[in-house]
Amino acid sequence: MSEDDTKLMAPPSSFTPELQSESPKSAQISYRFMCPGPGRFQCSSTGLVFVMAQKTELVYKAIQWNESVLQPSGKIPAGLLFKIQCPEDAVCQLHLPHCETKDAEFLKSLLSVVHITDDGMSILKPLEITDTHVIVTVSHFSAFGIVRAFEVFYRFFSNPCPVHGQVLLFLRPPNLNSQRQNLHLVVLSRNVPLEEVRRRHQDSVYIPAPLKCLLFEDQHYTVDCPTAFIVQPKKADFDLDFGPNYHPTFEIRLSTSIKVVTIALRDQKNTDVWKHDVDLTGPGPEGNHIFRHGL
């Protein structure tokens, strides 16, 4: 399939995969999709796009990078590493989501895809790089992930471009003795799936909010929340993090009597890059606390 053919194709059909895990509390999940036949299909959970040649079952999961394997080739992770299982020749193209904002010509020299098998690692040249995905031709599967060329990235580091980011909110159960509650902010690149992060914060309640923002790597950010007792840490550097743990970037300590808080993420120039009024109450009458609803 040529690059021109790819551009002329209709948008992919979206599907919601079946989530599988060894136990309800397991942080490791797999995604399963019964593909109905040939076509282009996009996973609503991971952003992956599969160009299918036939009806088949797809099973895939995010696995941990081994950066010591990448370093000799001068590569660093630029997305999650996905282990994909399906019959040979069932998939003809794979589209992996990226978070870059740089122009397409620059991305051609910056991004590539690694294919890791039991026999070793190979570097795949992209067929095309769009505003959202890196596209490669595939025939058989094991593990695939987007990488950056270390030398190219740092050659242009003096004139950095932001990446597409996201801010995820997780509310911890309240401490009834101290009448305090902690709200965690997890600041990540756009191409980290929400479900991967939620599985690492299963004792917290995820609070939906507008996610998108633009972030600069290796620059520090602060959080402003006027109603907070304390925000920890006072500042934090933003780096690309592709798991597996997804620890909180910031912790905001609040009174349990607080129902709504305004939170702003600010850059080094004290400019808001993300801001939201966060509702800490559930949908029931009188705004009962979300933990009392078991949400």
Kindly label every feature range from the protein language model.
Residues 1-111, 115-295:
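A structural signal for beta-rich interaction modules in eukaryotic proteins
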